[in-house]
């Protein structure tokens, strides 16, 4: 490709509304342009990267035995009503009617469509297992699209769905997809972790996320410092303290705390160790309960894990925190004065709280706290559960080492769905015994556009993007200095351009009438891994300057050796 025949829309300045580095660099490198909130046009450089990602995904999915299909973006509402997700999905599901007043949705995912297809196409267990995938546009009406293509409303996704007659068969395909995803992200040169995860609104049982480690990530990824254990923070188990509860050394006393509405204020005003405080959060109880609310207690320096809390049998789903009005109607005190003593509703305490002694908590009286509370002496020990987020330094749940926490960008997610959708849509085949058998399903997603942004978040410097070779828009940049004035430079540039292309190497020849500084800056911004610079001074010695983008190292290579050198660098 020649720059004179290419749209090289680079920007010198960083757009003001671009928050994260990938968004900034994708705009500056001329990869994307914003059309509307959460909607982006992909320019030629961006499309080249996108296609590289797609091709790797497609190759590994095919190698794993998956079959490619293509399903409509627009889906009839009746399928979503049949599955029960019409009500469950909420405002992220864009709903509309056609001219015949028939309701439709723009697909955020395709479980319903593929299940409908399979229930009409398959009839016998002999046709299974099968795994179908597509690389298709999705739309989710995000309340606040941000970070460029990292959290956009329209995006490209690889979604796959497998169908089985047994859990064992599903497990085989699930393991194959796990391995395929590991190959995909390894081939792309990404530093990632596969972590245990919650199934969320998709549903099902087992689930793993593939997280690219990056400071800008929205997820907390938890992993052991000595073993292979890794999990999303939502799912990571907080192990109960090994040390037995210390004996009481204080009497419980009622203390006036009129200006301490938060744990931070209580700690500061009364010089308490935060580890000796407990915070009490009230949430709505499950429908049909004899109590409207449930009290959840965690240590003052810990955070409630809402995913774990929502799974408690007495807690309503989705998890809903009580309003101050609802709290006062039940407890007769405000949110800043709540605690376990004389709490008139069911209480669930975290494992760490169960191990505490001589602690401080609200007295369920406005402006008052109890200090020196001890379980079983001052209040009976309530139900104990793991309801907090783990913190760095906690013991690993597998018993090996301690936990580290890093930020991650979710680029892939695999689920064992079980029979959630096949039961709802009555997708079955004739089993080996001649009876109808509901299908068991798995689903497997990769955010193709998000992968591009995640790769940049891991691979950049002060000059621009530093692409991993496998997904770079071009492999080699040829920068001829003053080629429009030097016939020798121009002739060699054209010769090398042809020879490299003949070797199957993707080349960008910068044949613009631009200053060398502009040419260098653009190529480094775009992030092309290998650059060769042709100039009369070096050519006097039959030399060409080669520069590797990742480490910035330069070297002189003889003109006759440069093609072989580049082929070896790129193809090994």
Swiss-Prot record:
It catalyses: tRNA(Pro) + L-proline + ATP = L-prolyl-tRNA(Pro) + AMP + diphosphate. GO terms for cellular component: cytosol. InterPro entries: aa-tRNA-synt_IIb, aa-tRNA-synth_II, aa-tRNA-synth_II/BPL/LPL, Anticodon-bd, Anticodon-bd_dom_sf, Pro-tRNA-ligase_IIa, Pro-tRNA-synth_IIa_bac-type, Pro-tRNA-Synthase_IIa_type1. Keywords: Aminoacyl-tRNA synthetase, ATP-binding, Cytoplasm, Ligase, Nucleotide-binding, Protein biosynthesis. Its EC number is 6.1.1.15. It is an enzyme of class 6 (ligase). Its main location: cytoplasm. GO terms for molecular function: aminoacyl-tRNA deacylase activity; ATP binding; proline-tRNA ligase activity. It comes from the Bacteria. GO terms for biological process: prolyl-tRNA aminoacylation. It is found in: Cytoplasm. Pfam families: HGTP_anticodon, tRNA-synt_2b, tRNA_edit. The keyword Ligase applies. The keyword Disulfide bond does not apply. PROSITE patterns: AA_TRNA_LIGASE_II (PS50862). CDD domains: ProRS-INS, ProRS_anticodon_short, ProRS_core_prok. Homodimer. HAMAP family: Pro_tRNA_synth_type1. Belongs to the class-II aminoacyl-tRNA synthetase family. ProS type 1 subfamily. NCBIfam families: PRK09194.1 (NF006625), proS_fam_II (TIGR00409). Consists of three domains: the N-terminal catalytic domain, the editing domain and the C-terminal anticodon-binding domain. Catalyzes the attachment of proline to tRNA(Pro) in a two-step reaction: proline is first activated by ATP to form Pro-AMP and then transferred to the acceptor end of tRNA(Pro). As ProRS can inadvertently accommodate and process non-cognate amino acids such as alanine and cysteine, to avoid such errors it has two additional distinct editing activities against alanine. One activity is designated as 'pretransfer' editing and involves the tRNA(Pro)-independent hydrolysis of activated Ala-AMP. This is Proline--tRNA ligase.
